Curated annotation (Swiss-Prot):
This is Ribosomal RNA large subunit methyltransferase H. Keywords: Cytoplasm, Methyltransferase, rRNA processing, S-adenosyl-L-methionine, Transferase. Belongs to the RNA methyltransferase RlmH family. GO terms for cellular component: cytoplasm. Its EC number is 2.1.1.177. S-adenosyl-L-methionine binds at L70, G102, L121, S122, R123, M124, T125, F126. The gene is rlmH. It is found in: Cytoplasm. Gene3D superfamilies: 3.40.1280.10.
Length: 153
């Protein structure tokens, strides 16, 4: 099973890029991973920004991918729960899981309607930059749990 992580906007901070590279490299030991960035919309009303960013995200989404949104209103999963979700999709024949991180104003209703599942990393608010690292670390942690490796305690 392939994995893809989509997000809106450029990664601004060098330390965030290093974290992304570190965890992406670790994940690629287990499965093919692609990272894709949609251009951030600026200078429009929030709903217009969500719509345009959603249209850009759709273009990065393969037809056969199962879409998982990250949103503060989503279901909170434990790390073992996320590992189980990844394993169940892999074992169930899903060809690709795609995780999407929205822009500053979240996702449009039309993009949200395409999601198979919506999850939250926390009820706290994080920068969209930091969420990239947090998500990749949790995906990596999930693979170590699936494989019975000692990373997760």
């Amino acid at each position: 099973m392939k994995m893809r992580v989509l997000w809106v906007g450029k990664t601004q901070e060098e330390w965030v890029r290093r974290g992304i590279d570190e965890y992406a490299g670790r994940i690629r030991r287990y499965t093919p991973l692609e990272l894709a960035e949609a251009k951030e919309e600026k200078g429009a009303a929030a709903e217009a920004m969500r719509e345009r960013e959603g249209e850009r995200l759709v273009k990065l989404l393969p037809r056969n991918a199962r879409l998982i949104l990250l949103d503060e209103r989503g279901e909170q999963l434990s790390s073992p729960d996320l590992a189980g979700f990844i394993a169940a999709n892999r074992d169930g024949g899903v060809q690709e899981l795609a995780f999407a991180i929205g822009g500053a104003y979240g996702f449009s209703d039309s993009f949200r309607s395409m999601a198979y599942k919506t999850i939250a990393l926390s009820r706290m608010t994080f920068t969209h930059q930091m969420v990239r690292i947090f998500l990749l670390e949790q995906i990596y942690r999930g693979f170590t749990i699936i494989n019975g490796e000692p990373y997760h305690h």
